[in-house]
Amino acid sequence: QFNKIQTLIKKGIDEGAKLIAGGLGKPVGLEKGYFVKPTVFADVDNKMEIARTEIFGPVLSVIPFETEDEAIKIANDTPYGLTNYIQTKDQEKAKRVAKKLRSGMVDVNGAGIAIDTPFGGFKHSGIGREAGEHGLQEFLEVKSVGGWN
């Protein structure tokens, strides 16, 4: 995973994203192990690989937008859909946007997601759910029977 994240950070630099913090290599004082520098990119275009890939590391890609609809379009324009994050004081906006996001989970204002709610993604981020009633359904077998009146 460390090597994959390093490759993606390098790709972000090579594709022209502006490196704001972090970058390649390990954090000072954490040379042992597989630690990655927390990395922030600005001026990211949604066509860049760092915007289109689930990195699973401490890498943030900042993509500017003008309107709510544009933000939703950018967020949904990826083959993945594990989770999204919304930061707003407007609860109606949070509900409206969350409904339009194509991801298995949406975190609003850092509240986190309850441990007993279904966990899983959309698109290439996996199928099925873990936890909650939907997680239990993964262990059930459904049978259809026909032929009597």
Predicted regions and their residues:
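Structural signature of PLP-dependent enzymes
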Residues: 1-4
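Cytochrome P450 fold signature focused on the C-terminal beta-domain
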Residues: 18-28
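Conserved C-terminal structural/oligomerization subdomain of aldehyde/semialdehyde dehydrogenase
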Residues: 28, 32-149
